Amino acid sequence: MIFNSFLLGNLLSLCMKIINSVVVVGLYYGFLTTFSIGPSYLFLLRARVMEEGTEKEVSATTGFITGQLMMFISIYYAPLHLALGRPHTITVLVLPYLLFHFFWNNHKHFFDYGSTTRNSMRNLSIQCVFLNNLIFQLFNHFILPSPTLARLVNIYMFRCNNKMLFVTSSFVGWLIGHILFMKWVGLVLFWIRQNRSIRSNKYLVSELRNSMARIRIFSILLFITCVYYLGRIPSPIVTKKLKETSKTEEREESEEETDVEIETTSETKGTKQEQEGAAEKEVKDDKDLFWFEKPLVTLLFDYKRWNRPLRYIKNERFENAVRNEMSQYFFYTCISDGKQRISFTYPPSLSTFFEMIQKKLFLCTTEKISSEELYNHWAYTNEQKRNNLSKEFINRIETLDEGSLDLDILEKKTRLCNDENEQKCLPKIYDPFLNGPHRGTIQNLYSHSSMNNLLITSIKDSIKTLWINKYQGILDTDCREFEKEFAEEPMPNLNLKSPSSQGKFYSENQSKNFFDAATTYPNDQTIIDIEESLEINEIKKTVPRWLYKLTDDLEEEEIENDEESKPDHGIRSRKAKRVVIFTDNEKNQNTPTSTTETTSTAETTSTTETTSTTKNTSTTKNTSTTETTSTTENENTSNQDQSDEVALTRYSQQPDFRRDLIKGSMRAQRRKTVTWELFQATVRSPLFLDRVDKTFFFSFDISGTLKYFFRNWMGKDAEFKISNSEEEDTKEKEKKREEKRQENERIRISETWDTIIFAQAIRGYMLVTQSILRKYIVLPSLIIAKNIGRMLLFQFPEWHEDLKAWNKEMHVKCTYNGVQLSEKEFPKNWLTDGIQIKILFPFCLKPWHRSKVQFDHRDPMKKKGKPENFCFLTVWGMEAELPFGSPRKRPSFFEPIWKEIEKNIIKMKKKCFIALRILKERTKWFIRVSKEKTRWVIKIFLFIKRIMKELAKAKVSPIPLFGLREIDESSINTNQKYYINIKSNQIIHESPIRIRSLDWINYSLTAKKIKDVVDRTSTIRNQIEKITKDKKKLFLTPDRNINPNKIGCDDKGLESLKKIWQKLKRRSNRLIRKCYYFLKFFIERIYTDILFCIINSLRIKVKLFLEAKNKLFYKNSSNDETNKKGIDETNPNTIHFISTIKKSLSNINNSNNNSQIFCDLDSLSQAYVFYKLSQTQVFNKYHLRSVLQYRGTLLFLKDRIKDSFGTQGIFHSESGHKKLRNFRMNEWKNWLRGRYHYQYDFSQTRWSRLVPQKWRNRIHQRCMVQTKNSTYSDLYEKDQLIHYEKQNNYAVELNQKDKFKNYKYDKYDRLSHKYIHYEDKKDSYIYRSPLQVNEAKEFLYNYNTYNYSTYNPKLFFMSGDISLNNYLREDSDTEKNLDRKYFDWKIFNFCLRTKIDIEYWTNMDIGANVNKKTKTQTNYYQIIDKKDLFSIAIHKQINPAKQTKTSFDWMAMNEEILNCPISNLELWFFPEFVSFYNAYKIQPWTIPINLLLLNFNGNENVSEKQNINGKEKKDLPILSKSNQKKSLELKNKEEKKKPAQENIGSDTQKQGNPGSDPSTQQKDIKKNVKEDYDGRSDIQKRKKKKQSTGNIAAELDLFLKRYFLFQLRWDNPLNKKIINNVKVYCLLLRLKNPKEIAIASIQRDEMSLDVMPISKTLTLAKLINKGMLIIEPARLSIKRDGQFLLYQTITISRVHKNKHQTNQRYQEKRNVDKNGLEKSIARHEKLVGNRDKNPLLVLENILSSQRRRELRIRICLNSGNVNVVDRNPVFCNGNNASNCDQFLNEERHLDIDTNKFLKFKLLLWPNYRLEDLACINRYWFDTNNGSRFSMSRIRMYPQLRIS
């Protein structure tokens, strides 16, 4: 079995080797390149389709393969690659070939001279086919500029060793793929030839062949391809060239030269502040030096590549450029780990500079060093430097141990000096050798005089050495020019041109002397001053550079009237036009101008407009109409002429891909950005998809859905709304779609007019002509014609009405976007920018005018549908509703006339129809009556005739007739006679049956039948009448009488019954209707009462039970004082129902949050880890470990210093015999796990401030139950109480004054070294159990006040693995806890237990006061505003016994804050949580570093002297809407009042707040506004804008100053309203009597009065309350101040307390002198001079920070002897030798060189995320400039194998 597995393993390894071999991979990549199909395939196909013979097919195939082979060879052969890879080379080759190709195919007789034979011509054509395929194969890669499959070959080229084999195999693979491809093409062609349908259509085949023969398709294709590529890369002729300056300048003349900028050598450090300003000046002496570098060659093969695809990235604060080159791939060789490797992201500027230097040094070139020698030299140098550093460090320690306090022990910073004797140095602020905390802050950076004074400063502390690098001979420093540059253009804070870089290029003939000048002396590392040793001619040569500051079109328009001459703009901005909509000229002459009110209204308009609109530069297409207002105020004091212009900037609506491109640069492809959300504020790259917590597919918010569902369910009158039918929805969608389509059509038309040359001028003239024609010719002629026609028709003329309507029509000139100006004033540059003509009250010719009385009786619904009373004139004289809209249908003149005629005709027809109908009815009736009469007469006549016959026959008397009647009466049923009232004259008609003669046979039968029928009908009729009468009697209906001839006796009773019935019916209906609501209200009352009673009774019982149970814990406690000390003063009788549920809810969230703590490692940003590791100030102590862990008396290390290391957790004395730790990944992960709770490891002073024991015991009991929050559940209550007792006893005995001092490095040094050195969890500080007693070493946390021998209490450490949310006191959150970092549910546990209401606490955080009766109210966040680096003294005034401090998770940059339920604070049954949510929106605590929340203003002396009146009444704005309707009264007890209200020196009165009246704060406001404006951009200065001292301006400035992390926005409807208001106001400002237009505009809803308030006193707080303005936190990390980046390393000295605090409450100020802001405390003062406050010395501070890191890294990069186990001869000889034995015995466990080196490389270049590299670069290698990111390059390292 083992044998089988062995065989299997061998087979697998063999297969892997075969697969990874160069040949197989080359075949694979070559086969892949088959699929990158280009135009060259078309020629190959054409040769096969045309069937011109096998010769052409063979030649085409040969050319195709030859071209591809040349491309593969060009990968390996550099000259061929240069020739084919350069874009302009291909362009130059293409153009002649295109010309030749065109003539060859269209005019073959040019080449046919008649004497040539056909055979030779055919041969020439075969050669042309070969040439076509060859050349187009070479063109293939530039037609598709970046085909991925072709680039794969280039990528793999740098990974394989045998490059030629790879090229050959990839070419073979490509050949195989193309053979298969051509075989496939042959099969397809064969199928086409065999297909009958294609073969039968001979016409199609012949046409195809003719077109292919004429080859027009390929000529067109070739032409389009060349033009396309010329569009992508600007041709060298058209490109904007650099400015040429021809004359050679001396050094004296250079002071007058302002255009020529100086090349920075700090390019080698990565500063990309190159400038484009000046081109190379040819020096006359060196004209013939490089004669071959002529314009043609540099035009086509310019390796400097001035036209590179670069983007200009602005710094928002200082408007200076950082040229970002991180996205470029640039291959160059660099030395990495002692070996030369190819870096694919090498800085192009460095390679350019290196090649320039190589040209200068061609005389001194030496042989190339082999790679082994290079590596050995690197290893040797590294070893030497490491040993030197170690020796130097140990010597310094020994000197310090001898007791010497000489300042030479400490390593000092190297300063940049100009002259060694005069000691003139750069100021510390500008010294490039000084980084981080050595720099001070600058307040007044921008005045030229102070800048010049700063430059020549004598500093005595600096070292008098001149440190010059190898290139300093070429690049000498010229201070005068440097000074001149400062005077001309102030130096910014951020992207500082380092003073060392200001040099001049000397001429090339001085290159020999350069090497003599650059000889170094290794002992003192100085160089002899060049000016003393050599006489150098002062002929110099400037290097072309990019413009340091490029402006765009908008900035150029803003500064066009400036006095200083500025260069042309270098950036193409968005296509925009500046439209001036109002100009107010105030001159000395009495010119008629607008009133002051009008001007101020215009200014208010422009200010609001500026705030409203945002310029979106990241999207490629901006479909919304964006208009930005800029107010330009130009003052000319000499002329005393002031002109104010209010202008709108109109942007083009089409996608503008030229936007933000540098002129003359290559068009860079935009990065691939996607939007995967429905609403997304910013575009994000898919590279960082893993950083987003929710993707589109998993963004189901279940809680949000439930929330809305239950809200509707539990509402009072909540009903589920039934949506409209689907038809209405579809109609609405169709309507919106149609409106959108029309809007897009209008935009397209306007853009078309805007792009065509001279179209605007033509259109403008046509519009003006149409306006004049309409107003003065067409309409008057129509009026005259109409009235003459009325007079001809004998009607009154309507001259007055028509002329009145004609006069009312106004033709207002508008800008291109429709902003109204006036009737007579044309817009500025209207011929180029465009014009619109708006017709107000357009005249409509009517045939007659109705009286106005008729309008009043109209339906009001019809008035609403009335069209708007304006239109826009089109080019053809039509009317349109909107600019560029479709022409609307004008009301016709004859239409009402035709309607009136139709009405009259209809009326006439109606009358005629009525008459005809009556006549017709009368005739019908007459005919019918006449027929009936005739019939009756005939019947009578026949009857009489029949009787006469009967009488004549029978001669009987007429009595039988009457007898018959009697018989009939008697035959009626007697029973029915009772009910029938027969009138006396009633006649019963017999049926008209002929009476037969008596002697007929059938007479008896017939008579019997007739009698039966009569009886049956009469019986039925009587029964029906009886039934109806019975019904009437039963129902007693009083509506009818039973007998119509007489009134019933009880008729009145029936009427009253009827009324009673109706009333009952109404009441019952009303009761039924109200029954639902009554029942609902009743049930709700019952439900709430019962629920309240049940819950409160349960709550009281549970509380009593808990109190009874907690009494058991009190008996165990003996410390009565601490029991009385801080017990919550909660009244047990008061019952808080809401708070109970809220508390339980927050507990649930608390447990849910903490349950994920131990598994979620991804939320820790590795960049932050490296940031913290870089901040550690203690070096790598592998060499000193034996000394520090020696139990005996140390030789040179005092116990005091050893105690300091013990305090910092660098070592434990117990771990002396443990093995030497190493870098291991499990240690890394353990550290990551422990980092979540590291903030909970507190010192004794922190434990002393724990909450009273009643609360402690209760929380501890809960902690025992909730095992989710605790790692160790085996804690004993008794030990815990002992622990607390000792803690509190110790805290009482501490001195109050020194109790809260902070030691700087105690926490994170320990953490960093724990990570780097430790592996054993047992004795680690992080993994210690909470009640473990460290008996071996007693840590003394207060070094000043205690005698170490007498007082040695046993102290305890608390584990970080236990959630201290169970222990820490949170009561201060309800008061003034100003350092809370983010909003957490844990706060609810404690703030809801006290008497302070939630609303008050929320308003306190926001800065809003709801109740005016509240006496003590401070703007709390104004305190935070002033709590910057220099406000540490303020904290010392607070009484620390009452100000408790909580500890929250300060890693707010990670995902853990996303897991907190911030977004779901608005729970459905607790609307009070909405206030928390709104508070979070206004002031979220998500910023990780305290600096981000602060105003970085240095001078705090004023604020310390000020006191806030604690009883001052203030009405602050209510910023959250949910708080408006609620008010509360707070009982301010004396114990709740803190000293901070009187002592905290936050100048709240100076700062103000958005809602307070700013008029009382004017003096301080002016000062603050001035300070704030100092840091603004140069463009704002160039405007020379007045600082507004008005209330609104001051308030806005203060508001923006406070909420700089937030943005104000409003909804789109408000934006549209404001745009409309601007348009209307622009018109009103120019009218003499604007009242009529204003009223009409308000009636038409054009102008909304609520948006444009008439009063100026409407504050921002009111706007926010009205819902017009919405405060949102800024999602982007906007830099508040340039000083934040420049002095970023100051944060090491004063990081937030939650991060670095272990044993003291407050921090003392460090590294910064508050009085002299431009001077920083020296290192020796910081370490030695302040010994009272800081008795212990961190040894590593002897070295500078850069040398410190160098020592650590060199120790880890220690390569060489493998068997050496970190041995240092200093420690391994003499008395110290025994200390090293314990390390040498464990040699087998450590491969110290290889393993540690590998782990260290994993540490430096981890394979986690790319953006971490930038952070490593910034923080580890001590660079704090963002532009130096290009130095941190990703390199492809070879696979490292551990031997």
UniProtKB/Swiss-Prot annotation:
Compositional bias ranges of the Low complexity kind: 590-639
Gene Ontology CC annotation, any one: chloroplast inner membrane
Membrane-spanning intervals of the chain: 18-38, 64-84, 87-107, 124-144, 172-192, 217-237
Keyword Cytoplasm: no
Protein's UniProt keywords contain Transferase: no
Compositionally biased region (Polar residues): 1543-1562
UniProt-annotated stretches for the region Disordered: 244-281, 557-576, 582-647, 724-744, 1527-1586
Compositional bias segments (type: Basic and acidic residues): 269-281, 730-744, 1527-1540, 1563-1580
Acidic residues: bias regions: 251-264
Localisation per UniProt entry: Plastid, Chloroplast inner membrane
Keywords, comma-separated and alphabetical: Chloroplast, Membrane, Plastid, Plastid inner membrane, Protein transport, Transmembrane, Transmembrane helix, Transport
GO biological process, one term: protein transport
Membrane topology: Multi-pass membrane protein
Oligomeric form and interacting partners: Part of the Tic complex.
Similarity field: Belongs to the TIC214 family.
Free-text function comment from the UniProt entry: Involved in protein precursor import into chloroplasts. May be part of an intermediate translocation complex acting as a protein-conducting channel at the inner envelope.
Protein name: Protein TIC 214
The organism of origin for this protein: Nandina domestica (Heavenly bamboo)
